[in-house]
From Swiss-Prot:
InterPro entries: IBV_3B (IPR005295). This is Non-structural protein 3b. It comes from the Viruses. It holds the Pfam family IBV_3B.
């Protein structure tokens, strides 16, 4: 015979753990968003990786 009370209790624990994990993932994503324009610039139809923010000021871009 199945013990439905134990199954439901285990399910509740799993749901709580998943909820906690999702909240943690969400908080990490909110604090560590990746902005490609902090490390790349778009010039001549290509993205170029920058060594530093000073390397590209945006003033010399030609279209």
């Amino acid at each position: 015979m199945l013990n439905f009370e134990a199954i439901i209790e285990t399910g509740d624990q799993v749901i709580q753990q998943i909820s906690f994990d999702l909240q943690h993932i969400s908080s990490v994503l909110n604090t560590e968003l990746f902005d490609p324009f902090e490390v790349c610039c778009y010039r001549g139809g290509n993205y170029w990786e920058l060594e530093s923010a000073e390397e590209f000021s945006g003033d010399d871009e030609s279209s």
